Structures are given as C-alpha cells and as structure tokens.
C-alpha cells in the first residue's frame, strides 16, 4: 500500500508562471545566468521571488496533474506528497546507491530553505482505469499552459475536487510498490530530515509535513530514462579473461574494438575494458523477470554483474563504483578508464 496525499503548494501565479519557471542553475552558463537575472525580474533564480508575491500558497490541499510535451513525446503524471515511511520500509523501491555526503548536503538544504523545490520522480505500473480518471480531470481548463525555449509545452491542472482526490488516494493505496526513477538523494535526504525533526519533536504524531516529500508520479509507459554510466575501479580479483568468462553466463558478448560504442536497445549494455569496447546482450532465458524493478537496465546490471561478479553489494557505501550522467558525451566511458581512474565502465541506453 503506497501513501500519497495532496498538499498546499507554493507556486507561481497563473499570469507569471512562464517567466518564473527555470531549469536548475547548474544547467546555465554564467552568461545565461547573468542575462536571466538582468532581464527577467520574475525568474525563479531571484531571491525576492516570494517576498514580491510572485508566488502564491494554495489555500486547500491539492494534487497537481503535470504534462510536458514536445514534437516527439508526451509525459503526464501527478505531483503529490509521498511518505518517508514508504521509502524506509521498501514500498518505494530504490535501484541506485547514494553517497552519504550528498544526502547530508541535501538535508541541510531542506533544513535551511524548508522547501521541496524539485520532486522525486516515481514510477507506477500502468493501469487503464486510472488513466481514464486522469483523462477526465484533464478535460478541464489547465491552470497553467505555457511553452519554454526548449520547445516544450507545459500544462498543469489543479485537483481539488474531493471525489477526484479520493480516487487518486485510493488507486495508490492499492499499489504494492512505487519505483524511484530519479531522485535517490532527494528522497534519502528527506528521510534523514524526518528522523532529525522527529527526534526534536516531543509531540511527534507522524502527520507532520516532514514525514512526506514531493514526488512526480508517472506510469511506466511514460518513463524515459537518460543514460547514467557506471565505472568500477577493479575486477574484484578476476583477470580480464576470467571476468569475460563470468559475463558469458548472462550475456552474449561481442568485441567492438577501440571506437566509441553505445548500446542500441533495452537489455543491451556497452562495456569498455582494457582499451576495447564490448556489447553485452542479455541472455533473457538466464535472467528472472519477476517485477517492474527487475526489468530496469540499472537493476539488471546490478543483479548480473555488479553484485555477483564484482562483489558490490551495497551501492550506497562502496567507493569502488562511480557514476556519471553524460547524456550527450559518451567519451567519459573511455577516458575515465584510459586515465587509470577506473578499470571498467558500463554504458546504458537512455
């Protein structure tokens, strides 16, 4: 049973949302940041955005249906408050390790700001009947409808009708699991914060806001994951030849030479080892697909290579593994191994 609840969002007023919306500051060059701050008085990057009433606070707890579309794809999901307890007890499934230092950094940010500015991306399994519930809500006029310079159309609907709210709550109450697609550190830091504030609160009831974190929940069919490459510092005592023999249990292996190589489909990985790229095709007959998590490439890599062969049980606290999300540049798969930082790297299909 997954717990979701409506919440009172702090959000831009309808007439200013297109000007307020912003990518993470890290996504901009210094010149772009300067231009936005100099020429857009409503940008989210300004410290005064709340003081000047550019933002409003919702009067009643609400869910939010958020849709992003471009010429190629449409993604639609629900922004809701999700339970820290679900994260701790495994209802919300994790498939990535986290770095303790970053968890603490994010927790300090939450303590300082008291603000969830970016939701955790959660996946739930597709359900046609629930799709119809969302479609009916979307027949109303959206609260927001605007385009951004990356040629995406953004639309958002408020869900404040009690019947519709109860339908959403009821659907997720019947879901056995939710899956983190992005935001492992954000959710882990929310759990840390909840523990700290619970310890400080003698009258803790479990219903306080710190027991929840903001999430964007989308169906599995709407999920598109960017590549997030893995780097391992050693072969866990194996020679290169022994390692390749071990891999053969789960994968059909093809040597692709020294030229950069990317995987082409699901259940297919690229590997760079000893100056050469390899393609790894999963032998599906040798692997058990038993739930939605087991179908994710990241989980397949863990269950077939990282844990059984390379001996990495705890992705959270193992300094032998590194990550990078080079969405446009696969060169790091090669350079991070050639320069001696790592022994082997794995690339996955975005």
Model-derived regions, located:
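A cross-family signal for N-terminal binding/gating loops and helix N-caps
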Residues: 1-350
